Amino acid sequence: IVHAPEIVDRMLVDICSNDKFQVEKSLDILQKTINKTIKLSEKFVGKPKLVVHFGGMCLKECVDCKKTEKNMYAKSIESFKKLNYDPEKIEILPENLPPKPWYLGGEWNQYGFMTEKYMIDFCKMFNLKITFDICHASLYCNFAKKDIVEYTKKIKPFISHIHISDTTGINGEGVQINEGET
């Protein structure tokens, strides 16, 4: 299992961005990571898995979050189609993301790859599974006031890999298990 970079040259990997340069740079690093992962897999048994964060974050809070999320979802589809890979040689696993991630020394607002509807639709469109981060799911469910058990039941058929840690509130990420609220 390989985890793709989230930050390159102090710029967030974000294929959902409206900034063409950022999307191009993000697609470039993801393509290089895909190619390198496939090359590394020649030394191991089985198809490699690549955990990917697609982005969809902003420093500012949006006025119309549903519209922002819908636009980022559309942009992620458009961008993902540009990646060149053979699903027989690598399993790409987008990871569900938290609502208030910390990047580059500050708290951001996440608008992509959190809601179960968009994750499921994306997975169906590209025949993908996901990396299910329990901490991220808990943070999102706390933020969106959703039941984590119901949320997880909907996502479960698409899970291929799991990240486990505890959490607190809507931005307390990566807490030691049994020291948080999950």
Where are these predicted regions, by residue range?
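Short, functional N-terminal and low-complexity linear motifs
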Residues: 1-3, 118-119, 152-159
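Gly/Pro-rich active-site loop or hairpin
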Residues: 14-23, 107-113, 136-182
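Hydrophobic faces of well-ordered beta-strands that scaffold small-molecule active sites
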Residues: 1-5, 48-52, 92-95, 130-133, ...
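Active-site acidic/histidine proton-transfer and metal-coordination neighborhood
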Residues: 13-129, 139
